[in-house]
Regions:
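RNA-binding accessory domains that recognize and position tRNA/RNA substrates
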Residues: 1-23, 29-33, 37-45, 57, ...
């Protein structure tokens, strides 16, 4: 997997040949003047998409639905009821606990989309024909009871990705990228002793040795 910014061009995305795209959550409003908007043509290139939280609102906004400021924020655990199952919600209990963290909400869904779940608001919508699925809640956190299964459904059943990821492959790729970027230069690293900086230190030292 690779994390890229919202303003990555469509050509750059296509060049990467992703099996799928996840539009992540965030604190912004799609209705703000400085909203982080992606190229709407991303929905027309045939790559499966999963929109999470802000990613759902973004999908609705760009494709002709409406997103409004909520009367009250929804933060914390919420009951999620599936109203129409789809490939991402396959095998998920009709009622389950999910984790919400949003203020804006989808008021009307775009043409071609169906509401697939609700809480106090529209909690999921999808255009199954185009392999576009969205969730207002966060499936990636442990508080969402069956969130891991939803992500698994998207990655393996919708995107048809293979279960071939290995930590050693990531280490080798990262070490190679560090060597290429650093070249003959030296690196100064501020080490806090936490997990992130410690892992970074090990990888950088493995890549460039005494240049660190």
């Amino acid at each position: 997997s690779e994390v890229v910014p919202f303003n990555t061009t469509l050509d750059e995305i296509i060049e990467k040949k992703p099996a799928g795209i996840i539009l992540s959550g965030g604190p912004s409003s799609v209705n703000a003047e400085d909203a982080h908007l992606v190229d709407k043509n991303i929905f027309e290139i045939g790559i499966p998409i999963l929109g999470i939280c802000y990613g759902m609102q973004l999908t609705a906004h760009l494709l002709g639905g409406t997103v409004k400021k909520g009367t009250k924020g929804e933060y914390g655990k919420a009951n999620f009821e599936i109203t129409k199952s789809n490939s991402v919600l396959s095998g998920i209990s009709r009622n389950s606990t999910v984790w919400m963290s949003h203020f804006d909400e989808v008021e009307t869904v775009p043409e071609g989309f169906e509401i697939s779940g609700k809480s106090d608001v529209v909690a999921a919508m999808a255009n199954e024909k185009k392999n576009i699925f969205t969730l207002q809640f966060h499936p990636e956190v442990s508080h969402t009871e069956e969130g891991a299964k939803m992500i698994e459904n998207f990655v393996f059943n919708v995107c048809k990705a293979e279960k071939n990821w290995k930590l050693t492959n990531y280490i080798d790729k990262t070490v190679s990228e560090i060597r290429e970027k650093v070249g003959n230069d030296k690196v100064i690293l501020g080490l806090s002793g936490g997990v992130d900086s410690s892992v970074a230190a090990v990888l950088i030292h493995k890549a460039i040795g005494d240049q660190l």
